[in-house]
């Protein structure tokens, strides 16, 4: 008997395999619009997609493309992986030390509005290129920026629903360790996040009603 699929894991490869098992009939990712160096696939047993894109290609076979304007026809793929940047700052925290390491690894946007607009536009583009019932796998992370709490996974879900997706599933990737700067300990006002999310969105007209809006 197959092992029960859980919603949490310390291993993102396990999460991706679980998503493919539950939600992608052929078990394959067709397109990765933010491929980077292929960390989801290298040595994991997960088959790399045929279509690999990145704004700044770093690996062989990756084409230069913006996730908001992909060189794909409408309704041409069945499953897309999207792992966008999650940082946005102009502050001193990313100019040296741990902050600079994070910047080099993950990329950074100038402000939260630009970052989240990128998310929304990329979601719309994913909806354009996915076939009916196609799957968008969206990795995202909440964070604190300039003392404010940004629940990005909530924003992502809301934008996906507006674009025409159904939130079919969500997985939580747990971390045992995080890069932490001294100033983050000295000035801590919020819990340090040791998790991120893998949303599973299906291109579908299915809608969920959580409450009756009519007055009674």
Positions of predicted regions on the chain:
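Class I S-adenosyl-L-methionine-dependent methyltransferase catalytic core
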Residues: 1-216
């Amino acid at each position: 008997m197959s092992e029960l699929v859980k919603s949490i894991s310390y291993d993102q490869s396990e999460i991706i395999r679980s998503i493919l098992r539950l939600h992608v009939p052929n078990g394959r990712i067709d397109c990765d619009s933010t491929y980077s160096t292929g960390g989801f696939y290298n040595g994991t047993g997960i088959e790399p997609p045929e279509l690999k894109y990145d704004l700044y290609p770093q690996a062989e076979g990756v084409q230069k493309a913006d996730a908001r304007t992909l060189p794909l026809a409408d309704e041409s793929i069945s499953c897309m992986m999207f792992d966008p940047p999650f940082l946005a700052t102009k502050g001193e925290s990313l100019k040296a030390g741990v902050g600079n390491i994070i910047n080099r690894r993950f990329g950074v946007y100038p402000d939260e509005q630009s970052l989240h607009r990128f998310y929304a536009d990329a979601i719309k583009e994913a909806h354009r290129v996915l076939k009916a019932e196609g799957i968008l796998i969206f990795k995202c992370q909440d964070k604190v920026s300039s003392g404010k709490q940004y629940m990005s996974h909530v924003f992502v879900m809301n934008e996906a629903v507006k674009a025409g997706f159904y939130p079919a599933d969500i997985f939580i990737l747990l971390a045992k360790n995080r890069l932490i700067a001294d100033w983050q300990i000295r000035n801590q006002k919020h819990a340090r996040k040791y998790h991120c999310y893998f949303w599973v969105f299906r291109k579908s007209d299915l809608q969920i009603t959580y409450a009756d809006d009519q007055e009674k």
